[in-house]
Amino acid sequence: MAPVTETGIGLLCLCRQGFEPELAGELQFRASEAGFAGYARTQRNDGYVLFMCDEAAALAPRLRWRELIFARQKLVVLAELPQLDPADRITPMLEVLADAPRFGDLWVEHPDSDAGKPLSGLARAFGNALRPALRKAGKLTDKPNNRLPRLHVVFVDGTHAFVCVADPADSAPWALGIPRLKLLPEAPSRSALKLDEALLTLLTPEEREALAKPGMRAADLGAAPGGWTWVLTRQHMHVLSIDNGPLRQHVLDTGLVEHLRADGFHWHPEQPLDWMVCDMVEQPRRVAERMATWFREGWCRHAIFNLKLPMKKRWDETRLCLDLFQEQAGKPLVVRAKQLYHDREEITVLASPLR
């Protein structure tokens, strides 16, 4: 039998390759804040962080997936299998799941990293082999059932896997934590995918329906060439696009856009707006302060904005900017932030009273 680590060893979180130190720092900070002891086990460019904690099952609901910034996915580790036999990977997994409850679905995954991506074929083939074995053992429903825990097997190489569990209500609903979004030909720029992903990731379906309604009024600061403006028009919002640069003509032709040639960093509306969005290349602290001014002055009710992170101490800068924003906003707000799949050296922030 393959060696097995002790079950319930910690949390496994997937992230963008190269951002393991930021995720490790965030997990350490959030766990300590919640009163849990633990430590991060990771290597740069692995694309994941294992946060070792004896009380992982109790810690998981305290670290909500939607509130974690650098985690694409959050899983509770049931077992680590570091020396699997390629001739029989299924038997040791069934053995560690002998006392586990029935699961509503199975996802077999790998980190989104240089070492992890070549494992996609193994993950797909192994999932097809493991599903019938789990069903025969009474451990997996015939059809996906989101009311039951979801089983994850995460391969980090061909003979090393983590067997994990996720709460479907508190985890990413996409394999690898990556939403599959298609860039439509009419999108003015790839940045449109950022705002599409932000709306999917930072808001629940119920919140999206309540907060992104046709007829709402929005401002897009630093709008050119119009990627984020275009996304807002697809929500049937009326948009003030603020930029000295040009917008794509087909964005203007929607009839929902007014292009104002001005500096998006200094412009503000005469009347309060429902939404403000901003994806400007500027120092993150300056952006955080300007976004706070918008809320303090009552110029918008909801906002989505990007913070471009420095090359070093990115977790420290993230905390500083978000604290600065909340201190200066002058009102209680729900603030959620994520490093999205379509983000690069940046995070995307939602701020809203959510009511």
UniProtKB/Swiss-Prot annotation:
Organism domain of life: Bacteria
Catalysed conversion reaction: cytidine(2498) in 23S rRNA + S-adenosyl-L-methionine = 2'-O-methylcytidine(2498) in 23S rRNA + S-adenosyl-L-homocysteine + H(+)
Active site annotation, chain numbering: 308
Pfam families, per database record: FtsJ (PF01728), RlmM_FDX (PF18125), RLMM_N (PF21239)
EC code(s) of this entry: 2.1.1.186
One annotated GO biological process: rRNA processing
GO molecular function terms listed in the Swiss-Prot or TrEMBL record: S-adenosylmethionine-dependent methyltransferase activity
Enzyme class: transferase
CC annotations in GO: cytoplasm
Keywords: Cytoplasm, Methyltransferase, rRNA processing, S-adenosyl-L-methionine, Transferase
Entry keyword Ubl conjugation: no
Subcellular location: Cytoplasm
Record: residues binding S-adenosyl-L-methionine: 191, 224-227, 243, 263, 279
Matches recorded under NCBIfam families: PRK11760.1
Job of this protein: Catalyzes the 2'-O-methylation at nucleotide C2498 in 23S rRNA.
Subunit structure: Monomer.
Family under the similarity heading: Belongs to the class I-like SAM-binding methyltransferase superfamily. RNA methyltransferase RlmE family. RlmM subfamily.
Protein name: Ribosomal RNA large subunit methyltransferase M
Organism encoding this protein: Stenotrophomonas maltophilia (strain R551-3)
Lineage, opening ranks: Bacteria, Pseudomonadati, Pseudomonadota, Gammaproteobacteria, Lysobacterales
